[in-house]
Amino acid sequence: MIYDSQVYTVLLIALLASVLAIRLGSTLYQ
């Protein structure tokens, strides 16, 4: 079974990873 806490944790990790990737990409682009 998948608990809501696990889903939220995965979503938070994915969100943080996307934000870090965007910041890294923008830094390398500059």
UniProtKB/Swiss-Prot annotation:
GO cellular component, one term: photosystem I
Alphabetical GO biological process terms: photosynthesis
Protein name stated in the entry: Photosystem I reaction center subunit XII
NCBIfam families recorded: PS_I_psaM
Record bears the keyword Nucleotide-binding: no
Protein's organism: Trieres chinensis (Marine centric diatom)
TM ranges: 7-29
Lineage top rank: taxon: Eukaryota
Keyword Chloroplast in annotation: yes
Membrane topology of the entry: Single-pass membrane protein
Localization (cell): Plastid, Chloroplast thylakoid membrane
Disulphide-bridged cysteine pairs: none
Main localisation: plastid
InterPro entries for this protein: PSI_PsaM, PSI_PsaM_sf
Family stated for the protein in its record: Belongs to the PsaM family.
UniProt keyword terms in alphabetical order: Chloroplast, Membrane, Photosynthesis, Photosystem I, Plastid, Thylakoid, Transmembrane, Transmembrane helix
